[in-house]
Amino acid sequence: MGRAFEYRRAAKEKRWDKMSKVFPKLAKAITLAAKDGGGDPDTNAKLRTAILNAKAQNMPKDNIDAAIKRASSKEGNLSETTYEGKANFGVLIIMECMTDNPTRTVANLKSYFNKTQGASIVPNGSLEFMFNRKSVFECLKNEVENLKLSLEDLEFALIDYGLEELEEVGDKIIIRGDYNSFKLLNEGFESLKLPILKASLQRIATTPIELNDEQMELTEKLLDKIEDDDDVVALYTNIE
């Protein structure tokens, strides 16, 4: 996804924050991580990352603690599911969900697509090969400087931990690696004592497409409906 789409997503995330829409999504990630690996972030890297991402969005500590406790209750009966869809203008969509009711989730997603002319849900696996899965970490540039490291030093230090690409974006450093290197890269940051601002597993289109303003406006109507669904925790497209 290109910068135009990322700017739109950034604006959307700000609206989520104002409406407290983002907190339920973050809470689900915390609950599922705690359910899978236990409620101690010191021994559960997945939970540690989920908490890190929640703190990056200013999620209150009480909300985080409640989400961890929820893992041992009936409310913690969550599962991860992925759905794929197509829209007009060659747009491909992958939706990652966390839900306690997959039947409800797929019914809601189908309704968004059915109400959008030319859009449809497709069988899982139809589009996955058109996206590469990557580990993506963000840290602050000044945190790197505080460790007396240059960007070259950082790149060299993390290569053995699976780094494939390092990019400077404003006051942040973006680190990308293979999907399977997520745990290893996390260990690399810990070995350097470099604080992670945000960490995620992302899907990046192998052949991105460009849309004009009119096409983007029409496509956004569907994407906004998907993003606003509490069960959808990540949305990926092939839009440049």
Curated annotation (Swiss-Prot):
It is found in: Cytoplasm. Pfam families: TACO1_YebC_N (PF20772), Transcrip_reg (PF01709). One of its GO terms (molecular function) is DNA binding. Transmembrane segments: none annotated. The keyword Protein biosynthesis does not apply. The keyword Calcium does not apply. Coiled coil: none annotated. One of its GO terms (cellular component) is cytosol. Keywords: Cytoplasm, DNA-binding, Transcription, Transcription regulation. GO terms for biological process: regulation of DNA-templated transcription. InterPro entries: Integrase-like_N, TACO1_YebC-like_2nd/3rd_dom, TACO1_YebC_N, Transcrip_reg_TACO1-like, Transcrip_reg_TACO1-like_dom3, YebC-like. Belongs to the TACO1 family. PANTHER family: TRANSCRIPTIONAL REGULATORY PROTEIN YEBC-RELATED (PTHR12532:SF6), TRANSLATIONAL ACTIVATOR OF CYTOCHROME C OXIDASE 1 (PTHR12532). This is Probable transcriptional regulatory protein Hac_0344. It comes from Helicobacter acinonychis (strain Sheeba).
